[in-house]
Amino acid sequence: YEMLRSLVGSEMCIRDSSNGVDTKYFSAASDTELNPKFISGWLDKENNAVSDYLVFAKSVLRIPEAHEMIARYTVLDEEAKRLILLRPYQIHAIEAIRDASKTGKSGFVWHTTGSGKTLTSYKATRNLLMDIPAIDKAIFLIDRKDLDTQTTMAFQAYANNDLIDVDETDNVFDLKKKLKSDDRQVIVTTIQKLQRLITRKLQEGTPEYHKIKNLKIAFVVDECHRAVTPGTKREIERFFGNSLWYGFTGTPRFAENPYPQMGDLPRTTQELYGDCLHKYTIQNAIHDNAVLGFQVEHNGPKNKKDETDSNLYVTESHMLKVLEVILNKSYYKLGFQNGKGKTYEGLLTTSSIQLAQKYYDLLKMVKEGKTTLKIDEKIKQVLPDFPKFAITYSVTENEEGSHVNQQKMQESLDDYNKMC
């Protein structure tokens, strides 16, 4: 059977539909506006599907849950001119942050890339300010200038019909002015501006120094695995003694991929921020069709475990074998049979920036004929200049090794400009 129920709050309308076997919810829209990708099924906190309509009704449609869905977990996007309903994993993450904040605990959220972290972090930041009267400011920290404007625009589009103010910071002096203000507000700024403020632009012992230092602040950190290094976070925490920290990341640091050893500084995301409050991994997202899936092909002997020594994967001999498969044994996969101008492009992803740089340098050597790997003549007949390649990665100013990364990026940009 078909069940359709509307919940009306102000001018907002949420609908759910069930056939008794499966249940979905979505925001009200005309037939021409209803997009299947905005129709969500409910998940529990462990990301297990909830299809039974009675269980769904108890989780979402009861009072006060229905009121909270409308008041807390909908966003009127001013730019897109539509009502956005948060997905279950976004709601569970925000609730987990709220619960942690009530007991004065920090933590991090592990949500995969492409799962809507900007919207989740906006609502989390907004709700921290709305729910906890003791918090003076909620600061959303990002690690790049270009993201500063981009994120602020997204936040302001979400906040246009909300009860809070979202302000960006033009410079360090603007950040200081907003922190000195008595207004309770969400501030979007970069880690560089904040660090410069507390280390160079405040004179100890002055009234403004004490006012800013004594603020009760909730920090929400975008891309927390890289945005704030352990040393920088400790420096900021020592200045802002009354602070809570909530990080968002799609790639947490674990014991297997820790931060470099720097004295007694934390080396994993958990050590740096606290417990993982909620997770929604790439496996969950692919299962829910929230992101593009993968066609996986394994190259290597069957029924054999991976090498336990990960250093074997970064040797030149292994990397050349990887490139041999990509460059010489992917003739049909790359569409060379279609002829010049009809071939496909590919993307090689690596486990680190350093490994990407090594592959880039090795590809340059292959192209210059300085390795044992030679491009097959059959391929060169179609594309004589094969392979043409470039490299991209995020260059930050506040990570260990950032100077080397910036230098290598400049070299690769010079290569790219010559190629063009």
For each feature predicted by the language model, list its residue ranges:
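Switch/connector loops and helix/strand junctions flanking conserved nucleotide-binding motifs
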Residues: 22-35, 148-151, 195-199, 228-229, ...
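Flexible phosphate/Mg2+-sensing switch loops adjacent to catalytic phosphate-binding sites
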Residues: 132-136, 163-167, 257-276, 367-387
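Signature of the SF2 helicase/ATPase Hel1-core->accessory helical subdomain module
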Residues: 27-29, 191-309, 319
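ATP-dependent helicase/translocase motor core
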Residues: 1, 6-138, 146, 150-161, ...
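Conserved C-terminal RecA-like helicase domain
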Residues: 310-420
